Amino acid sequence: MQPTRSVRPFKVVSDYSPSGDQPTAIAELAGRVNAGEPDVVLLGATGTGKSATAAWLIEKVQRPTLILAHNKTLAAQLATEFRELMPDNAVEYFVSYYDYYQPEAYVPQTDTFIEKDSSVNAEVERLRHSTTNSLLSRRDVVVVSTVSCIYGLGQPEQYMNAMVALQVGMQINRDTLIRKFVSMQYQRNDVDFSRGNFRVRGDTIEIIPMYEELAIRIEMFGDEIEALYQLHPLTGDVVRKMDAVSVFPGSHYVAETEVMQRAIGTIQQELEERLAVLEREGKLLEAQRLRMRTNFDIEMMQQIGFCSGIENYSRHIDGRDAGEAPHCLLDYFPDDFLVVIDESHVTVPQIGAMFEGDSSRKRTLVEHGFRLPSALDNRPLKWNEFTERVPQTVYMSATPGKYELGMGDGVVEQIIRPTGLIDPAIVVKPTKGQIDDLLEQIRIRVEKDERILVTTLTKKMAEELTDYFAEAGVRVRYLHSDVDTLRRVELLSELRAGVYDVLVGINLLREGLDLPEVSLVAILDADKEGFLRSSTSLIQTIGRAARNVSGEVHMYADVLTDSMKRAIEETDRRREKQVAYNTEHGIDPTPLRKRIADITEILAREGEDTKKMLEGRGGGKRSPTPNLRREGKAAAGANELETIISDLNDQMLQAAGELKFELAARLRDELGDLKRELRQMEKAGHLS
């Protein structure tokens, strides 16, 4: 079945119009893309509005677009920006849905098998399903993704074939529809009505699709669909009446019965062939292990059409040949889609590296009888497979890599900022007395309520420098690879909010950090040639001071290295061009002011939801928070649960107000569990 996609124009909605270098860059990019050039490079200086340029480019060329970022944080930032710029179009967010993921692995040296362990983020899983739903049902789609988009995903044809289209007046037997939902990997649950489940009440079926927040009610009269409604799953309030609706599967790995039977047959055939090889090599333990694990999976697939780790059998389900590339998100796009690779100097090498890292782990599992050889074909795409699937690519970076520069026919430059801000002045200073000099520079900027970034070469130096500054009375923090993602975001928000003034880091102060309050970037040991002090790294680090009117970069070095020369020359070239443009057009640089977004927004929504729920139940009087041990929660009655929820909500909002975000996040999760428990009690009729 070929998808029928609705057509709606891409449209940018903004109070601003393209300015600076943006109009020229947009026109040249659109011209090259429309002319069919496969690779186009945008060299855009930090803070010149590359994201907005990409949005206006999409509006010009009217193509479904995949935007690739090199980590989840940047992808989330881009998705937010594009949703604001294109509110009438489908802007989707597609990243790995694991909050925590430990892949299965085997360590032969210690004979240790590590079971797959993971924690799935339900909201991110919904967004992934929302992405594929949008791609198969409409053309005006922008997907912001990480390298997750090159990993195996179910076959789009099977996903489409499993979809059920419902409309008022349609003839279908109720039991047939129920069986259809089960085959689509939805579960019947008349008590816990949540995403991925459906419930049946007489001639009424209600289902919450994996990609939706609202439920669908199907009212039947005999074998005819009498009415279709979209409703709030908690309150049951009807949001709107519908004439027709399509429900997509609850899993990307769904397959029809005939397909699954064929797959089971080829899995059994491969198992026999592999067992013969292992036994011939005298690997009897491995053969027995493989036989037990695979037969268990086959039995699960025969009984329920699914098994844990079914993606490892995707080659059989898809009917692919050995070594053939898996289906992935790219296959869900129309043929004429566009790819925009953000921070391409980092993202391009990342895409190319995914395959080897994945296959080396799986080869060990196959050799020791934990998986069939076909599991090797559940993998990310190789670089050449990625480029074969992508019709046209726009590479965006302030420092494009050699690969991108070699692919594009000259770069499109975007150097002039809409705000008139110019690249920071660079000052090279000797290393002797560098710490005392830096301390003096910090004090000057703190008096002006400005922020400072300091980048070092080692974690030890970052820690010692942080301690030294703290003893000198400086409000300082440091950022390194051991700091988890949530804490990194919090640290950056706290820096912008003025909770502290100086952030010390190593390699984390480069791409994508949007910190307009930073007026000084200090680079220690700038003359130590290497990855952290290459011209690319230096230019990216310099860019962190480019969003402030009085931005400066101080490089502490005794020798002017080639990398430093290239970085300084390129920055001076851009700065000269920017100053000339401002002078010609009479522009005064204006400081960039961006909203400081953080976890408090999520917590505020959680607090509002709690307030509404308690008001709906009449509320509960406040009392000290009881012990929250598991057995305490289980024994708590409805009134006690309400009291706990109310107190936890207050504690969560108080923690957020005190900027204790990790505590607030833990309280939010505990609050969510308790509210689910109370709602389930209510649905089950256990509340008076």
UniProtKB/Swiss-Prot annotation:
Forms a heterotetramer with UvrA during the search for lesions. Interacts with UvrC in an incision complex. Signal peptide: none annotated. The keyword Ribosomal protein does not apply. It is found in: Cytoplasm. This is UvrABC system protein B. A motif (Beta-hairpin) lies at residues 97-120. Belongs to the UvrB family. Residues 31-188 form the Helicase ATP-binding domain. It comes from the Bacteria. ATP binds at G44, A45, T46, G47, T48, G49, K50, S51.
